């Protein structure tokens, strides 16, 4: 029996509708939440992602603006831009699109973003707020994972959760969010002994390692909920066959585009899991939806939640 598909597109649309209603209420009180996106140079993938963010802002009624310094920009000039956005009262959220060019000190730039406008949730102050369960801005993808669980009525309290991957952007924050929700959490990584055995203990398994199809059915407890955070592009025909042999729909898309996306979980995991997020269309759509939610949250937190 195949797993229940947890539809990220549907949940993302629900969240955007809720955000739009919240923005309309704020506008009636004279406040329009504002998001500034900084995109350095012309990275095609980043440009697509930023276009999607701008489109989401238009859908939800959030004011947005783009700043596009050249890829020759210096750290000092980029700092000056970030600091000017920090000072503006009409901007509630600042997002610096990564990666930045090699000559730019990325860490210095991200630390320069005011914590109250850090809608990516990467600033150490927001990380501290998350770890101490205080109101702050939470990284978008982990927050989206929690929304999938909540809106799909997956029990978290008392559940055994295993997070494969310990990145600052996904692995560590989702582990903290699950802990805060009273799950019993194990974080796994490249040095974990007998990874499949550890994963098989999980009622909730989160794969966030950036390795295509690494989590195979033998990693999964029957009936577990699996959140696949990975988005990996495959262009090699032999690798495609490993994951999607016999899948006519994927085959047609691969033949047309010369590539396809696969998560960190092998598609056959869906034959063992009880519920499963597909790639694409699972966790991915939630990232931008939660960015919109974070922008509204920042607008409220900056004003002491009095709006």
UniProtKB/Swiss-Prot annotation:
EC number: 1.5.1.5, 3.5.4.9
Keywords of this entry: Amino-acid biosynthesis, Histidine biosynthesis, Hydrolase, Methionine biosynthesis, Multifunctional enzyme, NADP, One-carbon metabolism, Oxidoreductase, Purine biosynthesis
Catalytic activity: (6R)-5,10-methylene-5,6,7,8-tetrahydrofolate + NADP(+) = (6R)-5,10-methenyltetrahydrofolate + NADPH; (6R)-5,10-methenyltetrahydrofolate + H2O = (6R)-10-formyltetrahydrofolate + H(+)
UniProt-listed SUPFAM superfamilies: Aminoacid dehydrogenase-like, N-terminal domain, NAD(P)-binding Rossmann-fold domains
Recorded metabolic or biological pathway in which this protein acts: One-carbon metabolism; tetrahydrofolate interconversion
Binding site for NADP(+): 165-167, 190, 231
Functional note: Catalyzes the oxidation of 5,10-methylenetetrahydrofolate to 5,10-methenyltetrahydrofolate and then the hydrolysis of 5,10-methenyltetrahydrofolate to 10-formyltetrahydrofolate.
Protein name: Bifunctional protein FolD
This protein's encoding gene: folD
